[in-house]
Amino acid sequence: MENEALKNILTRHSVREFTAEAVKKDDLLTILRAGMSAPSAVNRQPWSFVAITNREILDALCEKLPFAKMLSKAGAAIVVCGLPDKAKIFNLAVKVVARISLGDFWITDCSAASENILLASHALGYGAVWTAVFPDEKKIKDVREILKIPEDIIPLNVIPIGVPVNKNEPPKDKFKEKNIHWEN
């Protein structure tokens, strides 16, 4: 495939086994830039990111998050957090005009940022995987405590990033024509 963007999308897969090698700071900054390049409703960008390279913090998260055990060997992690209050400023104006509630668009916006983080990690030769925090109240509380995140910020997920143990693992082809419905 010649198109690099499509190749990156179609070959990305969740990686749960890492070599414990460090992730370069410049690479983390590039990955974060990709996350912040995601679309968001009315460009509100209701997100905040916590970049983690400290082994003690990675291990503390690993201990508290049952589906993030791969943090024990990850070289870094990014916690994608939502800023619901930032989205609400826009929501109040739209609610009056459109009579709809857009209060949870921070989830959609942060999810788009998360996908960009996963794709950028893959493009730079790293593996990554989305591990959910939101909407589990205990996980939210634990992540907030470990990272000292204020109450008005909600951790959506923790994305472990690292050098994959198996760099040649092929992705699964997830295309299913039965999931496509045409207009007629």
Residue ranges and their predicted role:
Residues 1-184:
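Acidic, surface-exposed loops and disordered segments
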